[in-house]
UniProtKB/Swiss-Prot annotation:
The gene is trpG. Heterotetramer consisting of two non-identical subunits: a beta subunit (TrpG) and a large alpha subunit (TrpE). The keyword Amino-acid biosynthesis applies. The keyword Amino-acid biosynthesis applies. This is Anthranilate synthase component 2. The lineage of its organism: Bacteria, Pseudomonadati, Pseudomonadota, Gammaproteobacteria, Enterobacterales. The active site is at C84 (nucleophile), H170 (for gatase activity), E172 (for gatase activity). One of its GO terms (biological process) is L-tryptophan biosynthetic process. L-glutamine binds at G57, P58, S59, Q88, S134, L135. CDD domains: GATase1_Anthranilate_Synthase. Its EC number is 4.1.3.27.
Length: 196
């Protein structure tokens, strides 16, 4: 059972994500990105082996309340998982570059290619996923690897040193056919930070 602090970036998918996590027996504590960062940091300190999960949301990482500062405060200390806007914020907080995708993807099902490792091990290749975004990662930060892509677009990244990963697509969407299994594998991978 994982202990997850979920930062809600005011997205309609947030509670789909919460439901899937709770269905896998995870404890999920939710804070909106407008909450004072010190309140969130104090909560993290009280959680045993916390995983910070960053929800999807509108706009850009810079406009997502305390999210960027929160990542900068806890990176390297606890595992972090980001979805869509959360993924973009991870990339930006670690020094990567986010830019416009050139088109808007809203409810688009795409077949992505992945590396078959860690959270993607045993999943279909290519993997059908749901995409809702207008921004993408243009340059990954140091110590990150690209572990999935669609054409030339980065769809996910992973940092094996800090146990941080981000997904441009939505594992919690019904259009991501193996999404529940992928989320379970993501949480299992992030939890490895506390086993080493």
């Amino acid at each position: 059972m994982a202990n997850i602090l979920l930062l809600d970036n005011f997205d309609s998918f947030t509670y789909n994500l919460v439901e899937q996590l709770r269905n896998k027996n995870s404890n999920v504590l939710i804070y909106r990105n407008t909450v004072d960062i010190n309140t969130i940091l104090n909560s993290i300190k009280k959680i045993r082996n916390p995983i910070l999960m960053l929800s999807p949301g509108p706009s850009t990482p810079k406009n997502a309340g305390c999210m960027l500062n929160l990542i900068k405060k806890v990176k390297g200390e606890i595992p972090i998982v980001g979805i869509c806007l959360g993924h973009q914020a991870i990339v930006e907080a670690y020094g990567g570059i986010i830019g416009y995708a050139g088109e808007i993807f809203h409810g688009k099902a795409s077949l992505i290619n992945h590396d078959g490792l860690e959270m993607f091990e045993g999943l279909p290749q290519p993997l059908p996923v749901a995409r809702y975004h207008s921004l993408i990662c243009n340059k990954i930060p140091k110590n990150f690897i690209i572990n999935s892509y669609f054409n030339d677009m980065i769809m996910s990244v992973r940092n094996n040193l800090d146990y941080v990963c981000g997904f441009q697509f939505h594992p919690e969407s019904i259009l991501t056919t193996s999404g529940a299994l992928l989320l379970e594998k993501i949480i299992n991978w992030a939890s490895l930070k506390y086993k080493g």
